[in-house]
Every structure is written in structure tokens, then in C-alpha cells.
Amino acid sequence: MALFPQGPDLRIVLIGKTGVGKSAAGNTILGEKCFFSSPSSESVTESCKQHVKKFGNRVVSVVDTPGILDTGKSAEMIKKEIVRCVEISCPGPHVFLLVIQVGRFTKEEKNSVEALQELFGPQANNHMIVLFTRGGDLGDMTIEQYVHKGSKELKEITKRCENRFHVFENTNRGRKQVHELIGKIDRMVAENTHMYYTDEMFQEVEAARKMGMRVIKYKFIAPLQKRILRFHSILARD
């Protein structure tokens, strides 16, 4: 088996709607079944979960989030999971993988990058890659052809991510698709001057952790609650 691409440690956060294959994508990246996945429209990830694996000298952390892009999720649930995501991916993720299923592109996904910028900050898209799942459904079409022939909304999503996208066939046990994704992530990280994503939420959590403090309520909670309302409004927009 080819060696996992070596480099600095990597923190990955998976984001997407319920049922698009986030958990399966996490398992594909890690090369083993760490997250429970099921081909269902019901969420099998109830809370943010993290798995860490060492490949040679490289430590890779993957955070699987519940379907925060589902408009049916309550503001309270989203707040709780964003806090949890920040805590377990501190000091900040190198990449947000926006997971979208081939052949399925919903209203919420059309607005997803803009909504996530509202939630995490305007610079979040500089650290974002679109990861398409169910690549086998493409048939003889390449993912580049799929995006090119797709709707203007799909093109806009990839454009907002500076045309960074990749495709997985989660039933494919070969590691080539994973190594190619890691290569794209590494190039993006290099373009970001090797910096991970951070904002006031990550900075506050990291500062508390360095001081050994157990925080009951972070200062960023109040503004986060307001951003979640705007996030919901953007997602639901036609």
C-alpha cells in the first residue's frame, strides 16, 4: 500500500447535510471504520465526534459533525455542536470539507458556503474544499465535467471555494483518492501560508485550554447565537 502523504499534522472538519456520506468520507480518509455510517436520511451522527490516527510521523484528526446544514436543526443544537466542534478541533482546522452528494443538490447546499461564512467568519471559505461523495454515480463522467455541466448554483459553490473540489467513492478501498485529496489540502494550506483557520471562538477556547481553565460559558456564545439566526435565514433562502 502506498504511504500516506507526509507533512505537518492535519485537522479536518467534515460539514454537510444529513445523509450525504460525511461519516463514510471520514472513514475513507482514516482507512478504517471510526465513525458509524448508514445510507439513511436520518442522522447517525448525533454529536460532533473526533478520531485521530497517525500515519508515519503525521497525525491526522478528523471531526465528523451532525447535519448542521439541515434547516430542521434547532438553534440550540447548532450552538452546542459548534462549541463542541471548536473545542475538539482547536487551535483550528486546516480544512473544512463541505460534503455534497453527487446527483443531490438541495436549497440549503446552494446557500451553504455563504451560510458557513456567517457562522465561522468571512475567511472560512479560504480553508474550504467541496468533497463530492458517491463518485460511482458519475458513470463515465469526470468530476470536472460534472461541475462544468452543473447548475449555476453548483458552479457558484465551487467558485466560492476557489474551484477546490474532489470526489470520493466511499465503497472504494483504494487509497489513491485519499492521497489525492490530502495533496489538494496540503496545497491549499501552503497557499494559506501554512496557517490553520482561526477566529475569536477558536482563540478563546485555545487560550482557556492553555491556562488549564474549565469554561462554563464562553464570551463568544452571545454573538454566536445571533450569527446562528442569520445562518438559518441564509440556509432557508430560495
Positions of PLM-derived features:
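C-terminal non-catalytic interaction/localization modules
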Residues: M1-V62, L69-M77, I88, R104-I129, ...
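Glycine-rich, N-terminal phosphate-binding loop of Rossmann-like dinucleotide-binding domains
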Residues: I100-Q101
